[in-house]
């Protein structure tokens, strides 16, 4: 065996060993996705149960408190865009490094991603604390509702660094091949929030009654618990190494995907700001009804979010290991599940949606708004899931711009203009119709684009491999 053959054999062995260490490059595709998705679903469902419990607690306070949460939601979802973007960028780079067997780079990226999350979270928290009142006023909140929204956000902004770090920590664990831990830790944090909520809101166990601010304190402390658990697990598995060398290059690699992902995530809050402003024109009770309905529907939608979040590290590792057929299989399975879950959600919301809303608030207008929401939107969330899966696929393969384009087209080109026009003709029902139509149309386009992109990128990488093989053969001769 000559030197070239020996080097080629050793490289193949290294790639095989690296792929074996990365947990998603071997074994049943469906089983990996089920394990990833099921544990994430447990975590996200528990998180949404906590949000629903929060709505129940605040419904006991007043309808104004529920409306205040509706005005706070576009702001909190904006912060989630930063957390999700940093997490998506880190997940893409880390998963591909895991697939290629570069563990040293993985540990550096994990550490540097968390430092980035802390810095960004602190800056956002300070900015939000300064400008929260102006933003909420611009959304249309007035009087008692405005005061309650500010009370909630003042506490929430203090916990923004904890929030970002907990979301990024979950993403890092998934990217490094841990399927169960992120979901379990997320569920633990949510249970803490459910338990602390009434204590702070109603003043149980000798704690001062804080009202809506108590809901924010419960959330902040629950995120702190999650951070402690994530950090302990990353340290125990030796996935963290306090080395600052190379941090700028790590941040550049993370933000190559994470930057466009943040912009993509910010576009959705922009649409939420517009939609909330449109709904506010119909009264605070309509905003409250929309807020309650979205919290109930989000419980079902988070299953699809779990699927799209889980497929990202799977695609990243297998793309790094050049297992292209496994990537195609994963996309087929998750897209099929998304459509099936959309149909199931539609039927479920028709059967129990109105009843769940009545447990939170018995206001007649709130109930009517929620009923219209459940009749129109849930059937389209399967297509929303397909769009999210396509976005995750692009990011996992290191192609952030298509994901950004999808978000821009969905929100700026289609959704917001359509919602404004529909609101003029059919009121808040028209806004719901615009949401559903946008989900279906953009979901189909995103699926087709992602399918073509995978085939084209695979063909290009196969061509590059063929050219490299020919160069090696010419060197041998």
Task: Locate the predicted segments by residue.
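Helix-terminus/linker motif at the lipid-water interface of multi-pass membrane proteins
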Residues: 45, 49-67, 136-143, 199-210, ...
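N-terminal transmembrane alpha-helices
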Residues: 24-56, 60-61, 74-89, 93, ...
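Short alpha-helical transmembrane segments in multi-pass integral membrane proteins
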Residues: 1-40, 94-161, 207-259, 315-380, ...
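Structural signal for membrane-spanning alpha-helices in multi-pass inner-membrane proteins
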Residues: 128, 171, 197, 201, ...
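Hydrophobic transmembrane alpha-helices of multi-pass small-molecule transporters
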Residues: 78-81, 193-198, 227-231, 299-302, ...
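Short runs within selected transmembrane alpha-helices of multi-pass transporters and secretion channels
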Residues: 87, 156-174, 182-190, 215-228, ...
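Small-residue-rich hydrophobic transmembrane alpha-helices
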Residues: 66-126, 163-177, 181-182, 289-347, ...
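Transmembrane helical elements of multi-pass membrane transporters/channels
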Residues: 35-54, 155, 166, 189, ...
């Amino acid at each position: 065996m000559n030197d070239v053959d020996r080097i080629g054999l050793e490289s193949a062995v290294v790639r095989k060993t690296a792929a074996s260490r990365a947990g998603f490059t071997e074994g049943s595709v469906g089983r990996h996705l089920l394990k990833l998705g099921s544990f994430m679903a447990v975590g996200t469902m528990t998180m949404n149960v906590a949000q629903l419990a929060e709505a129940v607690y605040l419904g006991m306070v007043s309808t104004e408190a529920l409306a205040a949460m509706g005005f706070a939601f576009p702001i909190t979802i904006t912060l989630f865009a930063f957390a999700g973007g940093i997490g998506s960028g880190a997940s893409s780079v880390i998963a591909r490094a895991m697939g290629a067997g570069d563990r040293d780079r993985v540990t550096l990226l994990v550490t540097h991603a968390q430092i980035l999350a802390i810095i960004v979270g602190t800056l956002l928290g300070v900015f939000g604390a300064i400008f929260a009142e102006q933003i909420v006023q611009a959304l249309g909140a007035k009087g008692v509702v405005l005061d309650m929204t500010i009370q909630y956000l003042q506490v929430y902004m203090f916990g923004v660094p904890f929030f970002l770090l907990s979301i990024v920590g979950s993403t890092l664990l998934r990217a490094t091949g841990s399927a169960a831990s992120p979901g379990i830790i997320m569920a633990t944090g949510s249970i803490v929030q459910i338990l602390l909520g009434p204590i702070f809101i109603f003043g149980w166990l000798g704690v001062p009654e804080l009202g809506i601010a108590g809901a924010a304190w419960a959330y902040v402390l629950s995120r702190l618990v999650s951070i402690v658990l994530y950090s302990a697990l990353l340290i125990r598995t030796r996935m963290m190494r306090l080395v600052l060398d190379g941090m700028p290059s790590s941040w550049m690699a993370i933000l190559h995907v994470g930057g466009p992902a943040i912009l993509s995530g910010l576009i959705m809050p922009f649409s939420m700001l517009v939609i909330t402003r449109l709904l506010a024109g119909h009264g605070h009770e309509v905003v409250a009804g929309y807020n309650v309905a979205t919290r109930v529907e989000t419980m079902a939608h988070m299953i699809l979010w779990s699927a799209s979040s889980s497929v990202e590290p799977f695609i990243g590792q297998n793309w790094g290991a050049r297992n292209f057929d496994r990537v195609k299989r994963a996309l087929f399975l998750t897209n099929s599940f998304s459509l099936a879950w959309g149909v199931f959600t539609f039927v479920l919301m028709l059967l129990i949606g109105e009843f769940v809303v009545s447990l939170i608030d018995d206001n007649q207008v709130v109930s009517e708004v929620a009923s219209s929401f459940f009749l129109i939107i849930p059937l389209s969330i399967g297509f929303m899931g397909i769009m999210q899966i396509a976005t995750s696929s692009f990011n996992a393969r290191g192609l952030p711009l298509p994901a950004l384009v999808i978000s821009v087209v969905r929100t700026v080109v289609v959704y917001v203009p359509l919602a404004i026009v529909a609101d003029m003709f059919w009121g808040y029902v028209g806004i719901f119709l615009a949401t559903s139509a946008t989900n279906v149309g953009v979901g189909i386009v995103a699926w087709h684009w992602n399918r073509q992109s995978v085939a084209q990128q695979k063909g290009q990488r196969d061509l590059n491999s063929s050219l490299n093989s020919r160069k090696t053969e010419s060197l041998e001769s």
